[in-house]
């Protein structure tokens, strides 16, 4: 018999949407997180500014909520976190709505896996359409890539094929956002 911990672990390891840039664009460090240690572990930390502009973390800056790192997370290998025992507080605390639904017995694990697979397929479709439109930056969160591509295409003249691909992208991104907001992350309470 599987324990609730092993079921949760299986779901999280199957998913990874909170680490791979699909749900979040960045992760803000919390009080108590050691920026210095996380940087040594390979996270590309930046200072968060009020304007959302960021700069590299200077030596000597060690902790606090002023730091963040971009998604997709550089410690995520596609299946699991490579710094799991020392991951930031926000990562330790986050549980998506789908996982909570399984833990409460409202969703069967098999149903959760199907939902994850659907979301991953939809994210893959968005990535493919972004590539077709010239955006190959796999190190940037999906939402940021979509905004960057949208802005670029809206500012210039585009041919009919590009317009058709962009309309497909817009619909695919909308469908992905629906799945994410309904099943994974309805937003801050």
What role is predicted for each listed range?
Residues 1-189:
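Hydrophobic scaffolds flanking metal-cofactor catalytic centers in soluble metalloenzymes
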């Amino acid at each position: 018999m599987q324990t609730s911990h092993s079921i949760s672990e299986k779901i999280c390891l199957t998913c990874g949407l909170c680490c791979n840039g699909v749900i979040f664009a960045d992760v803000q460090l919390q009080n108590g997180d050691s920026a210095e240690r996380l940087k040594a572990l390979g996270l590309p930390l930046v200072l968060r500014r009020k304007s959302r502009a960021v700069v590299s973390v200077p030596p000597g800056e060690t902790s606090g909520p002023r730091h963040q790192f971009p998604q997709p997370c550089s410690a995520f290998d596609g299946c699991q976190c490579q710094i799991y025992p020392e991951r930031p507080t926000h990562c330790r605390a986050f549980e998506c709505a789908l996982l909570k639904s399984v833990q409460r017995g409202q969703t069967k694990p098999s149903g959760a896996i199907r939902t994850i697979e659907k979301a991953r397929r939809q994210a893959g479709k968005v990535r493919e359409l972004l590539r077709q439109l010239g955006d190959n930056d796999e190190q940037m969160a999906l939402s940021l890539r979509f905004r960057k591509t949208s802005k670029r295409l809206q500012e210039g003249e585009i041919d009919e094929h590009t317009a058709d691909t962009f309309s497909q992208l817009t619909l695919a991104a909308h469908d992905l956002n629906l799945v994410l907001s309904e099943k994974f992350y309805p937003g801050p309470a």
